From Swiss-Prot:
Protein name (database record): Acidic leucine-rich nuclear phosphoprotein 32 family member B
SMART domains: LRRcap
Matching InterPro entries: AN32 (IPR045081), Leu-rich_rpt (IPR001611), LRR_dom_sf (IPR032675), U2A'_phosphoprotein32A_C (IPR003603)
GO cellular component: cytoplasm; nucleolus; nucleus
One Pfam family per UniProt: LRR_9
Transmembrane feature ranges: none
Gene Ontology MF terms: histone binding; RNA polymerase binding
Assembly: Interacts with histones H3 and H4. Interacts with KLF5; this interaction induces promoter region-specific histone incorporation and inhibition of histone acetylation by ANP32B.
Gene name in the database record: Anp32b
Primary site of residence: nucleus
Compositionally skewed regions (Acidic residues) per UniProt: 149-254
Amino acid sequence: MDMKRRIHLELRNRTPAAVQELVLDNCKANDGKIEGLTDEFVNLEFLSLINVGLFSVSDLPKLPKLKKLELSENRIFGGLDRLAEELPSLTHLNLSGNNLKDISTLEPLKRLDCLKSLDLFGCEVTNRSDYRETVFRLLPQLSYLDGYDREDQEAPDSDVEVDSVEEAPDSDGEVDGVDKEEEDEEGEDEEEEEDEDGEEEEDEDEEDEDEDEDVEGEDDEDEVSGEEEEFGHDGEVDEDEEDEDEDEDEEEEESGKGEKRKRETDDEGEDD
């Protein structure tokens, strides 16, 4: 697929001004030149032209907001002054795997004041013994060359890689709706866990109350049983006492009757 056709498909019914990221990797650049890319892409921040067969960047339009440009695995041998003229905001440039042989071909990059990272892996220029020292001296604005700083410390991913399309935060400070949905889901999960914990605590409280009631019920039954036993025992004692009282009364009556008969007999003797 040629570059023009690819750009048309990538637009997806959008206007060029609405595009912030454009990936044209592996499409065909006729005559080794950039085609179909115009200065209407005023908000483009990331452009990738990996392995498209470019010989030069002389047809690159002005892209005032472009920050990252991927040009690796092409056949570019010079003409980098075009980059300095058209890409004032460029911070990351990847020229790995091109036909750059001399340090002098990099001199136009001195005018890219914002350039922080440059990659030249696989270019013949890297074969020089003093390659790194020379490039850092030529381009003092650079922080990283081939992924390492002047002290040979590897660059953090956040410095080497720049997201081409940085999504703007919404009014709530969220990058997009996805983060917000994830937070909502996490909040729901936490609420469900809290509800489950609350239900478990309620169940435990109910079980404790039931156990307390059972214990109290048993104590009440024991008290009632004790009272009944005591009452029964007292009842038996009372009955025995009543029987004894009746026997005593009968004895007294019989004793009284005996005395009466004796008096009557004595009286009869006196009469005789």
